[in-house]
Amino acid sequence: YHSGGNGSLVELDGLINILQDYSLELNFARSQTEEGYLNFLDTTDTFGSHTYQMDGEKFSGRAHNIRLRRVVEGSYSGLRHKDVSPTYRSNVGLVGKNNYKERSYWHGRTFRTDGAFRKITIHASKQNRLNFQDQKTRERLETRLNIETSFNINGVFEFVTKASEKFEGKQFSKQDEIKLAFEYSPSETFMLGFRY
């Protein structure tokens, strides 16, 4: 950089297919950062033992993503562990947030028939997120029902419970969201939709 400082990022990615129905996705990254001395940030805020000011500090960070998925005819499941340390930096801009550890689980089933309801999909997922101080910043449960019919009407019903969410230091209480959508498309050139 013109004002001094430098950064490096090393990442190892992998996708492993296990048997016929499973896949394991792995991403491991490590960053090394040395800040420049052009301090255009007028702040005294800190992250860990470091400042946000451009004052020549050196630090390293890490990021991990491990996801195991199973997909078979009519069913899918998965679990994911992801963490990004507070000092992780990605100069290519692929990581917009750091300082979190997240666990996610999901499962879905699809039923197909030759009747009026051609396809019905039921999906459920759970997400927990903590920061590196082990404070809960998000807990989310989502259920969704998708329906496709033989008379060109499709529908989605989604219910989301955010049991806990923290944003900029403020803890929000439990929030429930309901989404309802219908779509009628009798031809490729006409579609009528409703969302709530």
Regions found by a protein language model. Give the residues of each.
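A conserved hydrophobic secondary-structure block that centers on an alpha-helix together
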Residues: 1-5
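Exposed, low-structure sequence patches enriched in small/polar residues
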Residues: 7-9, 15-18, 22, 28-196
